[in-house]
Amino acid sequence: MRKWILTRILPTLLYRSCFHLVCLVGTISLACNDMSPEQTATSVNCSSPERHTRSYDYMEGGDIRVRRLFCRTQWYLRIDKRGKVKGTQEMKNSYNIMEIRTVAVGIVAIKGVESEYYLAMNKEGKLYAKKECNEDCNFKELILENHYNTYASAKWTHSGGEMFVALNQKGIPVKGKKTKKEQKTAHFLPMAIT
């Protein structure tokens, strides 16, 4: 007797479950038609993409951040009034205040606020400063898991490897050819101006 009841009821239960599922999906797609994927995920209580990837709105273009770039070697990146790039340990030095402008997704240009020079890297990996922004001034900004950022030339590479902005233990710029993402000389904290 039980076998007959299950055989008769099971197709009805499956049909109703599928019907409810189709109605639910259809309702969600109609309600979320004008929403971005992030908004849709949030509205249907799914895990949002931010939960799995790090979302940084400022990396999407047009944003300007004013920061001091503090290297893990204990030096602030500085561009002086003559356009010389080096490190300083003076926190309150006006030449270490940088304007970090987003050029494209993950690409930034770094400009000294006081000196009005842009940070640039040539094909040999040497850091220098320019009054006018060009492709040499574009850097790929990467946020590492240790909360430091790296800045690699968006234009130049060396033997297939990226060339990074880096300051050695004496605050002297390291040529990009000698840098790697894992080196602490290439790790910077963008510190808010206080």
From Swiss-Prot:
<dbReference type="GO" id="GO:0030036">
    <property type="term" value="P:actin cytoskeleton organization"/>
</dbReference>
<dbReference type="GO" id="GO:0034394">
    <property type="term" value="P:protein localization to cell surface"/>
</dbReference>
<protein>
    <recommendedName>
        <fullName>Fibroblast growth factor 7</fullName>
    </recommendedName>
</protein>
<keyword id="KW-0325">Glycoprotein</keyword>
<dbReference type="InterPro" id="IPR002209">
    <property type="entry name" value="Fibroblast_GF_fam"/>
</dbReference>
<dbReference type="GO" id="GO:0050679">
    <property type="term" value="P:positive regulation of epithelial cell proliferation"/>
</dbReference>
<dbReference type="GO" id="GO:0061033">
    <property type="term" value="P:secretion by lung epithelial cell involved in lung growth"/>
</dbReference>
<dbReference type="GO" id="GO:0042056">
    <property type="term" value="F:chemoattractant activity"/>
</dbReference>
<dbReference type="GO" id="GO:0010463">
    <property type="term" value="P:mesenchymal cell proliferation"/>
</dbReference>
<dbReference type="GO" id="GO:0060501">
    <property type="term" value="P:positive regulation of epithelial cell proliferation involved in lung morphogenesis"/>
</dbReference>
<dbReference type="GO" id="GO:0098982">
    <property type="term" value="C:GABA-ergic synapse"/>
</dbReference>
<dbReference type="GO" id="GO:2000288">
    <property type="term" value="P:positive regulation of myoblast proliferation"/>
</dbReference>
<dbReference type="GO" id="GO:0008083">
    <property type="term" value="F:growth factor activity"/>
</dbReference>
<keyword id="KW-0339">Growth factor</keyword>
<keyword id="KW-0964">Secreted</keyword>
<dbReference type="GO" id="GO:0060665">
    <property type="term" value="P:regulation of branching involved in salivary gland morphogenesis by mesenchymal-epithelial signaling"/>
</dbReference>
<dbReference type="GO" id="GO:0060445">
    <property type="term" value="P:branching involved in salivary gland morphogenesis"/>
</dbReference>
<dbReference type="GO" id="GO:0001935">
    <property type="term" value="P:endothelial cell proliferation"/>
</dbReference>
<keyword id="KW-0732">Signal</keyword>
<dbReference type="GO" id="GO:0051549">
    <property type="term" value="P:positive regulation of keratinocyte migration"/>
</dbReference>
<keyword id="KW-0358">Heparin-binding</keyword>
<dbReference type="GO" id="GO:0051450">
    <property type="term" value="P:myoblast proliferation"/>
</dbReference>
<dbReference type="GO" id="GO:0031069">
    <property type="term" value="P:hair follicle morphogenesis"/>
</dbReference>
<dbReference type="Pfam" id="PF00167">
    <property type="entry name" value="FGF"/>
</dbReference>
<dbReference type="GO" id="GO:0008543">
    <property type="term" value="P:fibroblast growth factor receptor signaling pathway"/>
</dbReference>
<feature type="glycosylation site" description="N-linked (GlcNAc...) asparagine">
    <location>
        <position position="45"/>
    </location>
</feature>
<dbReference type="GO" id="GO:0010838">
    <property type="term" value="P:positive regulation of keratinocyte proliferation"/>
</dbReference>
<dbReference type="GO" id="GO:0050673">
    <property type="term" value="P:epithelial cell proliferation"/>
</dbReference>
<dbReference type="GO" id="GO:0045893">
    <property type="term" value="P:positive regulation of DNA-templated transcription"/>
</dbReference>
<keyword id="KW-0497">Mitogen</keyword>
<dbReference type="GO" id="GO:0005576">
    <property type="term" value="C:extracellular region"/>
</dbReference>
<dbReference type="GO" id="GO:0098794">
    <property type="term" value="C:postsynapse"/>
</dbReference>
<feature type="signal peptide">
    <location>
        <begin position="1"/>
        <end position="31"/>
    </location>
</feature>
<comment type="similarity">
    <text>Belongs to the heparin-binding growth factors family.</text>
</comment>
<dbReference type="GO" id="GO:0008201">
    <property type="term" value="F:heparin binding"/>
</dbReference>
<comment type="subunit">
    <text>Interacts with FGFBP1. Interacts with FGFR2. Affinity between fibroblast growth factors (FGFs) and their receptors is increased by heparan sulfate glycosaminoglycans that function as coreceptors.</text>
</comment>
<dbReference type="GO" id="GO:0051781">
    <property type="term" value="P:positive regulation of cell division"/>
</dbReference>
<dbReference type="GO" id="GO:0090128">
    <property type="term" value="P:regulation of synapse maturation"/>
</dbReference>
<dbReference type="InterPro" id="IPR008996">
    <property type="entry name" value="IL1/FGF"/>
</dbReference>
<dbReference type="GO" id="GO:0008284">
    <property type="term" value="P:positive regulation of cell population proliferation"/>
</dbReference>
<dbReference type="GO" id="GO:0001938">
    <property type="term" value="P:positive regulation of endothelial cell proliferation"/>
</dbReference>
<comment type="function">
    <text>Plays an important role in the regulation of embryonic development, cell proliferation and cell differentiation. Required for normal branching morphogenesis. Growth factor active on keratinocytes. Possible major paracrine effector of normal epithelial cell proliferation.</text>
</comment>
